[in-house]
Each structure stands twice: as structure tokens, then as C-alpha cells.
Amino acid sequence: MDPKLLELLVCPVTKGPLTYDRERQELISRSARLAYPVRDGIPVLLENEARPLSDEELEQ
């Protein structure tokens, strides 16, 4: 994930920052408690495509 692109992207739900999880290929929104998939290098920032994050995942 290009760091400059990551600086421009925000969570579509909260408009908060996103962090990239390279291992899972996801963009994480801690404020929305959602993980958005990155497919073939393209972020899919759709709420209905995101998965909810557990408390354990948020603590990492």
C-alpha cells in the first residue's frame, strides 16, 4: 500500500484515519471498529464489504 495514498484515504463511516494491516490485506478503522478489504491492491471502502473488528483485534 502506497503510504501517500494511505494518507489520503479515510474511513467512509467516521471520516477517521485508516491503518494498513499488510498481513491480512485490510485497512483498519479503529473508530468504526471495521476492517476494509484490499483486493489486488485496491482498497474496497464499502461499509457492507467491511468486517467488524473484535476487542482483541483492536487491542493489537
UniProtKB/Swiss-Prot annotation:
Stored InterPro entries: Trm112-like
Lineage top rank: taxon: Bacteria
Gene Ontology CC terms, in alphabetical order: cytosol
Homology family: Belongs to the UPF0434 family.
Name this protein carries in UniProt: UPF0434 protein Dtpsy_1553
Species of origin: Acidovorax ebreus (strain TPSY)
